[in-house]
Design a protein with these regions (language model features):
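Extracellular N-terminal segment of 7TM GPCRs
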Residues: 1-15, 19, 272
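Extracellular TM2-ECL1-early TM3 structural module of rhodopsin-like
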Residues: 1-7, 23, 29-117, 157-160
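Hydrophobic residues within alpha-helical transmembrane segments
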Residues: 4, 8-11, 40-43, 47, ...
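Residue-level signal for the membrane-embedded core of alpha-helical transmembrane segments
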Residues: 12, 82-89, 177-181, 285
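Loop architecture of class A 7-transmembrane GPCRs
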Residues: 60, 64-81, 103, 109-184, ...
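Seventh transmembrane helix
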Residues: 174, 178-182, 283, 289-304, ...
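Intrinsically disordered, low-complexity cytoplasmic regulatory segments of eukaryotic proteins
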Residues: 185-273
Length: 341
């Protein structure tokens, strides 16, 4: 039964993230800047299900590593790299949402620049590699010997409390504080915009100044003296602040007051729609962050405690449960993406 559940989790992780990747490739409408970061998260989660889980299942069931030291090193590098990249991707998604709400104008101006998200994603993978992988590869060479048994597969710093505390701070605690900060500011910004919108709706005299475009067309067979035309333009400028243009189409019979009211209603409707969209995305992002915290906090705390007492105070089965909880997060993420759109 345990083996079946492990295999099922791996399959769900693979299929769920494959669907996300295919949706991004086939549907160009969702290929915007923010969704690049979801794609990055889906790629790392897919690799967890396709590579890390299948190699670990026999080891978890038998307690013995049969695949050799070289493949053990590769598995450790990939596992730590992919899980850390997944965490950093969640931070980047939160930061992107933070910018889209708090700095909407500059964010939209850079929406079509694909180089920015690509650079950010590359930076994520580089930082994730530098955090654990050099220690995995070179720890035994620096120490002069290996502390891991031949039939086991875990890192050399498995019981080094100081290293685990420092690495966990960068991998979990700093990202958790960062995404919490971003989400709190997102909700505060949305609430502030809602209050401002309510005030504007109640006081129509304080609506934003609008710029009106008009043209003066001479009547057939008649001409206005220059002074009369100038007086007309001056009068309109004082009352409506228009922008004079040439080569305009024929004027319509629409009342300026009615036109102003229509544009004002349209503007408020558009702003309200954007606000509701931001609010919905903020709530869904908060769900992703909460799931991340629930899945990662037990493992991180137990790993530090286990390192401090050298594995004597934490039962191995409890540690295994928290370890699989990390991978459950990779399986859940694809099902949380749709609520963000």
């Amino acid at each position: 039964l345990l083996a079946f559940l492990m295999v099922l989790l791996a399959l769900v992780t693979i299929l769920g993230n494959v669907l996300v990747i295919l949706a991004f490739i086939m549907d160009r409408e969702i290929s915007d800047r923010s969704n690049y970061y979801f794609l990055n998260l889906a790629i790392s989660d897919f690799a967890v299900g396709a590579f890390c889980m299948p190699l670990y299942i026999p080891y978890a069931l038998t307690g013995t590593w049969h695949l050799g030291r070289g493949l053990c090193k590769l598995w450790l590098v990939m596992d730590y790299l992919l899980c850390t990249a997944s965490v950093f991707s969640i931070v980047l998604i939160s930061y992107d949402r933070f910018l889209s709400v708090t700095k909407a104008v500059s964010y939209r101006a850079q929406q079509g620049i694909t180089s920015n998200p690509v650079i950010n994603m590359v930076a994520i993978w580089v930082l994730a590699f530098l955090l654990y992988c050099p220690a995995i590869l070179f720890w035994e060479h620096v120490a002069g010997c290996s502390m891991v048994a031949v039939d086991q597969c875990h890192t050399e710093f498995f019981y080094n409390w100081y290293f685990l505390l420092c690495a966990s701070t960068l991998e979990f605690f700093v990202p958790l504080l960062s995404v919490t900060y971003f989400n709190v500011h997102i909700f505060h910004s949305i609430q502030r915009h809602q209050r401002q919108g309510s005030v504007q709706d109640c006081d129509p005299q304080k609506n934003s100044r609008l710029s009106w475009r008009f043209c003066l067309l001479p009547r057939p067979g008649a001409s206005s003296p220059p002074s009369e035309a100038e007086d007309s333009v001056s009068s309109l400028t004082r009352s409506w602040r228009p922008e004079a243009t040439a080569n305009c189409p024929s004027p319509t019979q629409t009342s300026p007051t009615a036109l102003k009211r229509d544009i004002s209603v349209s503007f408020r409707s558009s702003t309200g729609s954007k606000l509701q969209q931001d609010k919905r995305r903020a709530k869904s992002l908060a769900i992703i962050v909460c799931v991340f915290a629930i899945c990662w906090a037990p493992y991180t705390l137990l790993m530090i405690i286990r390192g401090a007492c050298r594995g004597k105070c934490i039962h191995n089965s409890l540690y295994e449960i928290t370890f699989w909880l990390l991978w459950i997060n990779s399986a859940l993420n694809p099902f949380l993406y749709p609520v963000c759109h």
